[in-house]
Curated annotation (Swiss-Prot):
Disulfide bonds: none annotated. Pfam families: UQ_con. This is Ubiquitin/ISG15-conjugating enzyme E2 L6. The gene is Ube2l6. It catalyses: S-ubiquitinyl-[E1 ubiquitin-activating enzyme]-L-cysteine + [E2 ubiquitin-conjugating enzyme]-L-cysteine = [E1 ubiquitin-activating enzyme]-L-cysteine + S-ubiquitinyl-[E2 ubiquitin-conjugating enzyme]-L-cysteine. The keyword Transferase applies. Interacts with RNF19A, RNF19B and RNF144B. Interacts with FLT3 (tyrosine phosphorylated).
């Protein structure tokens, strides 16, 4: 119950001052512990479209970290094929109970533009980005145009 109240309060607070890279922030009607939003990266190759993202807060929040998942496919070395995001800030070993959702979303926005090649979950994409950045960008752009969501105006 404590998690639901805190998450509802943080959702309300974030909704009032939505950063420019986020749109359509909402929670499930039946469950405030599940948030949905549209991420609008500002740099290529991902800046051509938008991506739907889901945050799941555990019942033990804030003592356990939320999970982040792209529900729109994205070609990225730190995002598994099922959409789960590998973000050091929300790993069990790095999580701090005072971390706010807006900090997690800011870290996600940075990660999309600047992949963390120290901790990739898709090694083949990290290798391609390291060895042939132009080919990686071309493939990421094609993937973004194929699967990304139209950006709201």
């Amino acid at each position: 119950m404590m998690a639901s109240k805190r998450v509802a309060k943080e959702l309300e607070s974030l909704s009032k001052e939505l950063p420019p890279y986020l749109r359509q922030l909402s929670s499930d009607d039946a469950n405030v512990l599940v948030w949905h939003m549209l991420l609008l990266p500002d740099q290529l190759p991902y800046g051509l479209k938008a991506f739907q993202v889901r945050i799941d807060f555990p019942r033990e929040y804030p003592f356990k970290p939320p999970t982040l998942r792209f529900t729109t496919k994205i070609y990225h070395p730190n995002v598994r094929e099922d959409g789960l995001v590998c973000l050091p800030l929300i790993s069990n070993e790095n999580w701090k109970p005072y971390t706010k959702p807006y900090q997690v979303l800011e870290a996600l926005n940075v990660l999309v533009s600047k992949p963390n090649l120290e901790e990739p979950v898709r090694l083949e994409l990290a290798d391609l980005l390291t060895q042939n950045p132009e080919m990686f960008r071309k493939k990421a752009e094609e993937f973004t145009l194929k699967f990304g969501v139209d950006r709201p105006s």
